[in-house]
């Protein structure tokens, strides 16, 4: 059984976007962690944070949600979620690198995709996966974990909707993986499943294209997720 982690500060870099919003809302509703929203525009971050805190409070949560410019948000947190498009990952890590301390954890949920008339396809970066790219760019003392790739943002943000989905977690640092899995498990209805090291991240990121294609082909599956049994 995963232990619930002690109260932490979780930063969502790019936290005004859809996946950042969904994760922020779930953690604010279901946990007592402090949620820090990061954006290149601090005013947008503050507005989003106030909105998320208000929404969570309607579910009885006393969560603290604050908003800052990305580097300041990263400086305030121990776990930093890179909720940015894959083509911004490297520049985002470089922009916050001076705010990262040894032992902080970077979590990458992004997947490289391309779209044509047939649908979505996996398009990993030259590093092999977005998670590997993040690990290549991150400071040496800051472990990177891949998680939350295959979650539907709409389902996350719909707080009345039970999640009942799994998230695959990859990483090479055991403690960072354990911490990330514990944080994931604290979201009601979300089950983290360890899937191996960063070397297999490309396969997991590629599932995102499969899920989007299924969702776009089946109206009743707009916010589908995966469960492993």
Indicate where each model-derived feature is located.
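Rossmann-like NAD(P)-binding element
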Residues: 64, 68-105, 112-117
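Rossmann-fold dehydrogenase core element
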Residues: 126-150
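Short beta-strand and adjoining strand-loop segment in the mid-core
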Residues: 119-127, 132, 158-175
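NAD(P)+-binding Rossmann beta1-loop-alpha1 motif at the extreme N-terminus of oxidoreductases
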Residues: 2-54, 186
């Amino acid at each position: 059984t995963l232990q619930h982690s002690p109260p932490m500060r979780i930063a969502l870099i790019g936290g005004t976007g859809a996946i950042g919003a969904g994760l922020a809302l779930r953690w604010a509703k279901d946990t007592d962690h402090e949620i820090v929203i990061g954006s290149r525009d601090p005013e947008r971050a503050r507005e989003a944070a106030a909105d998320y805190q208000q929404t969570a409070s309607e579910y009885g949560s006393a969560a603290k949600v604050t908003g800052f410019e990305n580097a300041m948000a990263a400086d305030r947190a121990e776990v930093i979620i890179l909720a940015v498009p894959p083509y911004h990952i490297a520049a985002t890590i470089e922009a916050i690198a001076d705010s990262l301390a040894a032992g902080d954890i970077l979590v990458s949920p992004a997947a490289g995709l391309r779209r044509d008339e047939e649908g979505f396809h996996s398009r990993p970066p030259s590093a092999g996966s977005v998670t590997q790219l993040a690990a290549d760019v991150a400071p040496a003392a800051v472990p990177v974990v891949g998680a939350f790739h295959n979650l539907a943002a709409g389902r996350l943000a719909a707080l009345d909707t039970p999640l009942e989905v799994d998230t695959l977690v990859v990483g090479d640092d055991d403690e960072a993986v354990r911490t990330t899995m514990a944080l994931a498990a604290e979201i009601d209805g979300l089950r983290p499943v360890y899937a191996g090291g960063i070397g297999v991240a490309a396969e997991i990121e590629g599932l995102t294209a499969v899920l989007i294609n299924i969702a776009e082909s089946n109206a009743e599956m707009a916010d589908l997720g995966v469960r492993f049994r």
